[in-house]
C-alpha cells in the first residue's frame, strides 16, 4: 500500500504537492496554480440577503517561480511587482500551505487544483441543493438562504423582486471553505473573507478568496470515514446531547398560554413528548411576513402569565421547556438601552451611534461579540439570568448571518472578514452561557448559521427555514442534503423543523406534507415540530385527529429508537462520524457519490424518506448485502429495491448483523 504522507518537490519549472499517487497541487510556467488580483467589493444587504459583486481591476497569473526548500517565491512575468511567497509544510498525512502577497495593492487570490475526471467533491459547509458539488460554483458567505432558491420558479422570482430574497442553489446559512474528494483527500481554507470554490470547469478546482494572504490545510486518508474523522478532530466537538433531547418529540407551539392547553391534546393522543418549545415566550410582533417575535430576551408575562409554575409542572412530568433567542436586540426593547449604555453594540462608521439593522419592519442593534465584555454580558446577564436561571432547558439560537459590512466593531476588525466568523462567535457565547451555569451536556441550543469552527461549540444544527412544500431546492428534501453535507465537515448532529417553516404567496402546508415530514422526523436524532411563520394559514399537527394520531405514533417510534441513537451519538463522539451519513461514507462506490435522498442513520439503519408529492412508494438503493426491511423483516438484496411507503412506514432498512437487531424486531412487532 502506498504511503499517504504528503511530499513536496520542485519540478523542472515549478513544483508539486503529492499524497501517494495523487497530485493535489501542481504549478508550472505553462499552467500556473496561483493568481493575484486587485478588486473592490460592492456589497448590498437587505434583511440578510446579499448582493455581492467584484469590481476587478487586475488579475495576473504568477507564472514565474523560484523554489528553495519548502519556500516558493512567485511573480507575474507581465507585472513583476505582483508577487507572493508560498510556504509549504508537510507532516505525515497532513500538509499546510501559506501564501502571502508581497504587493500591498493585491487583495484577491486564486488557486487552481488539478482534479481527475472521476473525482467527486463534497463539503462546502451546509449545502441545501447539492451534495456532490461537481459542475458548479459555490460562494462561501453566510446569509439568508432565500425563499424558493430556484431561479426558474415564480416564488423565487417574486421573492427576488422583494429585497433580493429568492436565493439560489448555493445560498446557505452555513458555508464553509472545506471540501473533500473521493480520492480521499480534503482541503480547508482558513480564509473568513468572501471566497468561492469553482468546480464548473472539467479537470480543475479553483478556489478564490478576497484577501492577500491565507493558509490552506490538506488532509489525506485511506478511507472516507477516517477523512471525515480528521476534519471533525480538526474543528472540535461540542458537548454531547442529553438523553431528554433524543427520547421523544419536542413540540413547537406558539400560542401563548394556550400552548400548554394544546400540549395536553398531544399527550392525550399518546405522543412521546420530551419538550415544549415556545419561541413566543418573549412576546409577539406581527409583521407582513407573519407572526414574529419581540426581540427583548426576557419572559413576556402578558403572553405567558403563569410560565414559571407551568415550567415546574412540566419538569415534574419529564418534559423540558425551550425558548428562543438571537444575537440582536430590538431598539424598542428595554434591554436595548442597557446594552447601548454599556457600549455593547456595533457602531456606525461615521459616529458613535448604534448601527441599526432592518429585520423587516423593525430595527435592531447588533451585539458586538468582538468585545469580550459584551460576550460576557450576553452570556451571563441575558442567557444565564433570563433563560437558564428562569428554567429553560434549551432554545433556538437563531440568526448570526446579518452582520453588515458597513459598521464599526470593537476590535477594529474588517466587517468583511468578521461577517463569516460571526456565527462562530455567536455559538461560543451560547456554549459559554451554559458552561457558566454548570449545565454543559444538560441544556441544548440549536443553530442554523455557521462557519469554520462552529463545530466545537454548537451541539445541534438546524437546517433553517424550508418552504412548506416538496420543491427541489427549498422543500422537505433539502434537509437531507443539509444534514449530509454538514456532517462531512465535522458537524455530528443535525435536525429540522418538522412541517417546514416558510409560507408565503399562497404556499401552504398540505396534510400529505405534514405526514411525510413527521415520518422523516422520527428517524432523525432530534424530532422537533414547528408551526411556521403563518400558523393561522397552515395546517398544524393538532388540526385533525389523523395528523395528531400519526404524530403520536411516530414520536413513540422516535422514543423507542433512543438507545440506538445514543449509541450512534456516542460513536460520533469517539470516532468523529455524524449521525446521518451519505451512503458512500461506508460504501465507497461511484454510484453512491451523488445520492442525497437517503442516508445511513449510524451504520445500522438505512433511511429513505418520501420527499415527493403524490407517490405511494419509492425505489431505494441498497448498498451491499445483509439488509432487511424494518417493517416486514424481509431480507433485501444489493441494488435497487421498491418500498411501499404508506404514512407511518417510511422506507427503512436495518443491518441483520446489528447489535440492535432485537430493538428493531421489537419496533416491527409494535409498529409494523
Regions inferred by a protein language model and the residue ranges of each:
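Catalytic and substrate-binding clefts that recognize carbohydrates or anionic sugar/phosphate headgroups
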Residues: 2-245, 250-258, 263-268, 451, ...
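Active-site-proximal helices and loops of the catalytic beta/alpha 8
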Residues: 27, 34, 280-281, 289-359, ...
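Conserved, mostly hydrophobic/aromatic
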Residues: 99, 178, 266, 314, ...
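Flexible loop/turn segments at secondary-structure boundaries
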Residues: 187, 194-197, 253-258, 282-287, ...
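Aromatic-lined carbohydrate-binding/catalytic grooves of carbohydrate-active enzymes
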Residues: 240-411
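Generic beta-strand/beta-sheet core signal
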Residues: 251, 274-281, 300, 322-326, ...
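Alpha-amylase-like alpha-glycosidases and glucanotransferases acting on alpha-linked glucans and related
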Residues: 346-392, 427-468, 529-550
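Catalytic core of carbohydrate-active enzymes
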Residues: 432-443, 449-463, 482, 486-496, ...
